[in-house]
UniProtKB/Swiss-Prot annotation:
The lineage of its organism: Bacteria, Pseudomonadati, Campylobacterota, Epsilonproteobacteria, Campylobacterales. Its EC number is 6.3.2.4. Keywords: ATP-binding, Cell shape, Cell wall biogenesis/degradation, Cytoplasm, Ligase, Magnesium, Manganese, Metal-binding, Nucleotide-binding, Peptidoglycan synthesis. The gene is ddl. This is D-alanine--D-alanine ligase. Mg(2+) 2 binds at E303, N305. It comes from Helicobacter acinonychis (strain Sheeba).
Length: 350
């Protein structure tokens, strides 16, 4: 049986969602999770007892006096009256949504300290956290995406002039750097634009404008690469109205099993082929979820979710086996052997 530790929390707008994800994953993996490591908004690490992994505990966590830990090589450092003690960690699951977890900070830190983990590596995190870069990446691979306009604080005042030549009302306003539907809105008329931009700029320094397309079909597909083969979840067709907002995506606790999409085999194969293009080889070591649109029988990438909620376990027929197999197929960074031969040669020639 493979043991795991789960890292969750973080200095992120999705801090609470990460907690919910960790609680949900506990119900799936149960005793396979040896440690729960909580990262607070001040970047302090804490060990949380499994018995405390429930919403009531975290609602009052600021009142708790927990001993902070320090990340070190291969584990965590815990100080006590007997001196410092290293807690060796089993394979870590990065379950920090949004900033810190999905933007590459934690991936960089874990790689630096040589802590083995399941999750997107630095380059994959940085790219997928930026929606505009994701579109450029996808187009370069031959995966279609919706056209967009990128706004920032400098051109924000001229937003309508930039949008009008390309898009009619309604259109979608969304933060460029964000890991969820926070700050996303549909603008149906000109008077709604300023408010929508205010909301989006709260979460990101850049904002994307995309066309809003009526009656678009949306499909989600999760998966990972294990050695040379892909392991896919089934395709989910979200039950939505206009689009999945923050509450629908994250606060629906009944989402233990998602509705399976009733689609032709040919469309499922198209979704899988697009997923493979996006995953290879950038996302090695991670379970990701790709959210697709189907418009006029054409497949478009909506976004790549590098750390889906609870690792999208609800989409897999056998999530535990998938996770255990992935644990045996993680990318390895070769250790550099420093020989100092050049310095020795300098000394020899003196």
């Amino acid at each position: 049986m493979v043991e795991f530790c789960v890292l969750f929390g973080g200095a992120s707008f999705e801090h609470e969602i990460s907690i919910v994800s960790a609680i949900a994953l506990k119900e799936v993996l149960k005793d396979q999770i040896k440690y729960f490591i909580f990262l607070d908004e001040n970047h302090h690490f804490y060990l949380i007892e499994a018995s405390n992994m429930h919403s009531k505990y975290f609602a009052q966590i600021k009142e708790k006096k927990l001993p902070p830990l320090m990340l070190t090589h291969n584990g965590l450092l815990k100080n006590s009256f007997l001196g410092a003690k290293t807690i060796e960690l089993p394979l870590m699951i990065n379950l920090v949504h949004g900033g810190d977890g999905e933007d590459g900070k934690l991936a960089s830190l874990l790689e630096f300290y040589r802590i083995a983990f399941i999750g997107s590596r630095v380059e994959a995190s940085v790219l997928s956290y930026n929606k505009h870069l994701t579109k450029l990446y996808a187009k370069n691979l031959g995966v279609k995406t919706l056209d967009c306009i990128l706004l920032n604080e400098k051109n924000r005042a001229n937003a309508l002039d930039l949008i009008k030549p390309s898009f009619n009302f309604p259109f979608i306003v969304k933060p460029n750097n964000a890991g969820s539907s926070l700050g996303v809105s549909v603008v149906k008329e000109e008077k709604e634009l300023a408010y929508a931009l205010d909301g989006a700029f709260e979460y990101s320094k850049e904002v994307l404008i995309e066309p809003f397309i009526q009656r678009v079909k949306e499909y989600n597909l999760a998966g990972c690469k294990i050695k040379e083969d892909f392991c896919f979840s089934y395709v989910e067709e979200p039950n939505k109205q206009e689009f999945l907002d923050f509450k629908q995506k994250y606060l629906d606790f009944s989402r233990t099993k998602a509705p399976k999409a009733n689609i032709p085999n040919a469309l499922e194969e198209q979704l899988r082929e697009n997923f493979k293009k996006l995953y290879n080889d950038l996302f090695d070591g991670a379970i990701i979820r790709c959210d697709f649109f189907v418009i006029d029988n054409e497949v478009y990438l909506n976004e790549i979710n590098p750390i889906p909620g609870s690792l999208a376990n609800y989409l897999f027929d056998d999530f535990k086996t998938t996770l255990e197999n992935l644990a045996q197929s993680l990318p390895k960074t070769p250790k550099i052997q420093v020989k100092n031969s050049y310095l020795l040669q300098i000394q020899k020639n003196k």
